[in-house]
């Protein structure tokens, strides 16, 4: 079939067209001009269609405002999903209390410098998208911080496929915004979840000199059990916490919506882990904010967490 389309006209047909052209002066030239314009028109239409198709593909699959987001497989979080996770009723927090959360924040010496931003105490989080312990702890941080303010531009992602607890569903704080009248939240996701050819993972964000100094000073014993672990969280220069407060394996085999639904059931293992951890995080934040807001800091769940963590 394709060979037939490429076949030239046979000799007799070609001679007939040539004779007709000679019998009618100008006819051959007129036909050539028409055919030329027709070719230009077809070529133009094809070019316009091609440009339109490319534009659609770029909009759908091409880089977002952050090309690194696309490379890491992060997707904008569904607003309904975020609303479920950040809208857990106070009664559910109170029912869970500390739950199954462990690995408590540790107090810094009174000589430690206060960590502040824009006149408010600062909660500094340092993690990475590949890290399964970061993946687990982000759930607790996101839930807890939503009691003191609000997030926007959150994206879903997973921990690395080739690490412990592979593909743990989570959120990334990269490019997320947080607004609160009580505290500032600063997040640094150092790498994506995408391996590099020479080992490690693709770089995402860099620590500034002050952040690097805090990590070097406090991400070690006696403030944590080992040196250089993540996630690392500094609560206003008052407390630090390294690692996750629960087992990331509790999230295995589940997607974001399933986990969000389980948070509404205080008897579920996931609610006991994530909400219990969120109460511990909230109790530590309350020490940064002077006990504000009162409806959070004086709630039964946060008070239970404060009692367990020595406050």
Residue ranges and their predicted role:
Residues 133:
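Cell wall/extracellular polymer interaction/catalysis modules
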């Amino acid at each position: 079939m394709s060979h037939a389309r490429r076949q030239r006209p046979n000799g007799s047909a070609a001679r007939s067209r040539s004779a007709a052209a000679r019998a009618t002066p100008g006819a051959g030239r007129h036909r050539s001009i028409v055919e030329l314009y027709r070719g230009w028109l077809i070529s133009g239409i094809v070019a316009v269609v091609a440009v339109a198709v490319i534009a659609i593909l770029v909009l759908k699959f091409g880089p977002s405002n952050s090309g690194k987001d696309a490379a890491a497989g992060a997707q904008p979080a569904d607003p309904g999903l975020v609303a479920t996770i950040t809208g857990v009723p106070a009664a559910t927090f109170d029912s869970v209390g500390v739950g199954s959360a462990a690995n408590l924040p540790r107090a810094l010496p009174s000589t430690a410098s206060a960590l502040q931003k824009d006149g408010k105490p600062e909660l500094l989080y340092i993690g990475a998208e590949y890290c399964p312990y970061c993946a687990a702890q982000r759930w607790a941080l996101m839930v807890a911080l939503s009691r003191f303010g609000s997030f926007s531009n959150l994206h879903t992602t997973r921990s690395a496929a080739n690490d412990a607890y592979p593909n743990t569903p989570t959120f990334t704080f990269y490019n997320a915004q947080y607004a609160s009248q009580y505290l500032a939240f600063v997040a640094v996701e150092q790498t994506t979840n995408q391996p590099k050819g020479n080992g490690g993972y693709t770089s995402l964000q860099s620590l500034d000199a002050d952040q690097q100094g805090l990590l070097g000073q406090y991400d070690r014993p006696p403030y944590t059990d080992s040196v250089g672990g993540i996630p690392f969280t500094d609560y206003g220069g008052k407390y630090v916490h390294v690692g996750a407060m629960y087992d990331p394996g509790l999230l295995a085999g589940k997607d974001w919506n399933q986990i969000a639904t389980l948070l509404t059931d205080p008897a579920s293992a996931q609610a006991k882990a994530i909400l219990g951890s969120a109460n511990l995080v909230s109790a530590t934040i309350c020490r940064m904010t002077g006990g504000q807001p009162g409806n959070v800091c004086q709630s039964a769940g946060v008070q239970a967490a404060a009692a367990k963590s020595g406050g």
